[in-house]
């Protein structure tokens, strides 16, 4: 068996992570019906998936993925600027732009790649105006911070969802050189709370700032026709980034905005230029999801209603769920050991709700990140509420 020269360091780092109760391990899952997961020989009700609308197992997505793969092949064969720009890519982009109400859209390989590569390209375009002023929410996803760090720009961080603080920071630097960017999310993945997008857009307009909005966890679930919260802002936002891997049940990501913006990214975004294009099967699933999602208002309403009911139950049990107002409901228990124990209690009762610990969330805020799905019915929600109450009692008694 081969060993690397650094295995001793890797092993030591893993041991330290285990001592802090933050070591992670992969668990093998197999296919199960929507809203469920087969894990270690058991079928569990799945409250950890980002498949918010239950589309990952929808027959139309599977059928169109298979059809497009059969007709067009298993792969795109190259990056889009070489010879991988299929008519299918442009078809999906045009459909997405129509639904988003933007001039154009551009497909990318993943949400992480989009944020990590698009942000540096934007900052490069503005370099002639001086060092860009980049205002970021303190709880932004790691990929947004990574994109800023990759560009070598200084982040001016505002308190989470605190638009008064953001406006104060912008006013402090009024007249300073450099293009202004506000980078934030519409729905925050670990807390399930929302940004006030119309107010953000108005604030950005007042301060002549470019608004970059990550809609990964809103796409499919929130906003007009399920197309995200950018649609609530008159005139939209400068750039909306979103994914197809969560509410839309497939894979990949997009940016939507002006034609000039998307054409510029084709020429300047490394993550677009140097990556093999999305394959036909993935494009087929995306295309099918885009046909379905605008018609799922009833499913979205039921999903958000489940969130309201769960939050009320957690509050009655004395479990903090922060400012959640979406399908993502954190059960914040603080201690990493308590979060692991509560997750184990739920799994013993047939439910999967994974514990989230530092560094994914700040120290002292370990939690179960409960992700609801339209595939869950009232019976599954009842089961979750009962298991949380019993499990939390058991954890506190054992502490």
UniProtKB/Swiss-Prot annotation:
Keywords: Biotin biosynthesis, Pyridoxal phosphate, Transferase
GO biological process, one term: biotin biosynthetic process
PROSITE patterns documented for this protein: AA_TRANSFER_CLASS_2 (PS00599)
Originating species: Bordetella bronchiseptica (strain ATCC BAA-588 / NCTC 13252 / RB50) (Alcaligenes bronchisepticus)
Quaternary organization: Homodimer.
Requisite cofactors: pyridoxal 5'-phosphate
EC number: 2.3.1.47
NCBIfam families xrefs: bioF
Residue numbers bearing the N6-(pyridoxal phosphate)lysine modification: 246
Name by which UniProt lists this protein: Putative 8-amino-7-oxononanoate synthase
Pathway(s) it belongs to: Cofactor biosynthesis; biotin biosynthesis
InterPro entries: Aminotrans_II_pyridoxalP_BS, Aminotransferase_I/II_large, AON_synthase_class-II, AONS_Archaea/Proteobacteria, PyrdxlP-dep_Trfase, PyrdxlP-dep_Trfase_major, PyrdxlP-dep_Trfase_small
Gene: bioF
């Amino acid at each position: 068996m081969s060993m690397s020269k650094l295995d001793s360091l890797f092993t030591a780092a893993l041991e330290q992570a285990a001592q802090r109760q933050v070591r992670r391990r992969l668990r093998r899952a197999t296919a199960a019906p929507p809203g469920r997961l087969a894990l270690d020989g058991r079928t569990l009700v799945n409250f950890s998936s980002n498949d918010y609308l239950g589309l990952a197992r929808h027959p139309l997505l599977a059928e169109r993925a298979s059809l497009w793969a059969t007709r067009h092949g298993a792969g795109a064969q190259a990056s889009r600027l070489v010879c991988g720009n299929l008519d299918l890519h442009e078809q999906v982009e045009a459909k997405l732009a129509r639904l988003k109400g933007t001039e154009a859209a551009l497909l990318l390989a993943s949400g992480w790649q989009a944020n990590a590569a698009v942000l540096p390209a934007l900052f490069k375009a503005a370099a002639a105006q001086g060092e860009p002023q980049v205002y970021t929410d303190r709880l932004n996803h790691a990929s947004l911070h990574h994109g800023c760090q990759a560009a070598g720009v200084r982040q001016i961080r505002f308190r989470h969802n605190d638009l008064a603080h953001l406006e104060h920071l912008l006013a402090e630097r009024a007249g300073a050189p450099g293009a202004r960017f506000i980078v934030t999310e519409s729905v925050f993945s670990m807390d399930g709370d929302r940004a006030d997008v119309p107010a953000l857009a108005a604030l950005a307009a007042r301060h002549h700032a470019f608004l970059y909005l990550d809609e990964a966890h809103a796409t499919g679930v929130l906003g007009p026709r399920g197309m995200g919260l950018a649609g609530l802002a008159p005139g939209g936002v400068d750039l909306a980034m979103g994914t197809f891997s969560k509410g839309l049940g497939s894979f990949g990501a997009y940016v939507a905005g002006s034609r000039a913006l998307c054409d510029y990214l084709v020429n300047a975004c490394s993550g677009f230029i140097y990556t093999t294009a999305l394959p036909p099967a993935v494009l087929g699933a995306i295309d099918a999801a885009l046909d379905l999602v605008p018609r799922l208002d009833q499913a979205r309403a039921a999903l958000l209603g489940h969130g309201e009911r769960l939050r009320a139950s957690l509050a009655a049990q004395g479990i903090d769920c922060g400012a959640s107002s979406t399908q993502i409901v954190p059960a914040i228990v603080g201690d990493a050991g308590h979060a692991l124990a509560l997750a184990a209690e739920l799994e013993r009762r047939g439910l999967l709700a994974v514990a989230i610990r530092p560094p994914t969330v700040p120290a002292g805020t370990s939690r179960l990140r409960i992700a609801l799905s339209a595939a869950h019915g009232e019976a599954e929600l009842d089961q979750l509420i009962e298991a949380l109450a019993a499990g939390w009692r058991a954890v506190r008694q054992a502490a």
